[in-house]
Amino acid sequence: MSRVRISLIYLCTFMIITSTKTIEYTACNNTIIIPCTIDNPTKYIRWKLDNHDILTYNKTSKTTILSKWHTSARLHSLSDSDVSLIIEYKDILPGTYTCEDNTGIKSTVKLVQRHTNWFNDYQTMLMFIFTGITLFLLFLEITYTSISVVFSTNLGILQVFGCVIAMIELCGAFLFYPSMFTLRHIIGLLMMTLPSIFLIITKVFSFWLLCKLSCAVHLIIYYQLAGYILTVLGLGLSLKECVDGTLLLSGLGTIMVSEHFSLLFLVCFPSTQRDYY
């Protein structure tokens, strides 16, 4: 009877289930290390996601069996104690991960996905500031042009065109905020940035109506076109999570500066051919 009791106690010492840990991951993580430490010598290590096997390592034959859904999975170390799992982001799924050995020792880790902002708060704030200032300067340019010339069809087209640009970019700003990486926010950012090309058309209309098309105006237009190219390139590089929006901000900032130059040129260099009311 005493032998049976000793055997049961011996078995119970190996049926240990460690406390569950929680680990958060984001799209910014290229790989995830799921920790697991087993101090007792074992014949094999098995990693599971819920009830599905991910990886089985046989220490005797030193062979590894992988799930076809987790081909990037591997053990962090082949030492006797450290059997942490390394897995790439493309194969990561949220859920409960369990590592166990042939003696029944288990370690459970709950993996939770945490959603992050598309851009950091500083870059998001600058995007709204640059866009807002650009639209305000556009409004001033159109207002100055409207009060400086007699109303005509071309002036009406300029006013309608400016209103359409402003509405599209404002709607885009509402869709983009807060800057999460979803389809809605991607559409919002596209609406905030791509209509900037039409600012060049409004600029040409304003200078043409005020008879100010000169070499300096061409330089301003080329400068703004360069800003738009930077914006498009930055936008193309930003169509994924956890990216640096510096190039996109450079383009939006260049467009904003060109709008400043345009307004200064309109106000400070009056045309002798203007027709007032």
From Swiss-Prot:
So where does this one cross the membrane?
Answer: 124-144, 156-176, 186-206, 219-239, 247-267
GO molecular function term, any single one: thrombospondin receptor activity
Keyword Transmembrane helix recorded:
yes
Which UniProt keywords are present, listed alphabetically? Glycoprotein, Host membrane, Membrane, Transmembrane, Transmembrane helix
Q: Which GO terms describe its cellular component?
A: extracellular exosome; host cell membrane; plasma membrane
Q: How does it sit in the membrane?
A: Multi-pass membrane protein
**Where does the record say carbohydrate is attached?**
29, 58
- Source domain of life: Viruses
Q: Which GO terms describe its biological process?
A: positive regulation of cell-cell adhesion; positive regulation of inflammatory response; positive regulation of phagocytosis
**Looking at the keywords, is DNA-binding present?**
no
Check the record and name the InterPro entries matching this protein: CD47, CD47-like_TM, CD47_Vset, Ig-like_fold
Q: What exactly does this protein do?
A: Promotes, when overexpressed, the influx of extracellular Ca(2+), leading to membrane permeability and host cell necrosis.
Name of the molecule in the record: Protein OPG166
Species name:
Vaccinia virus (strain Western Reserve)
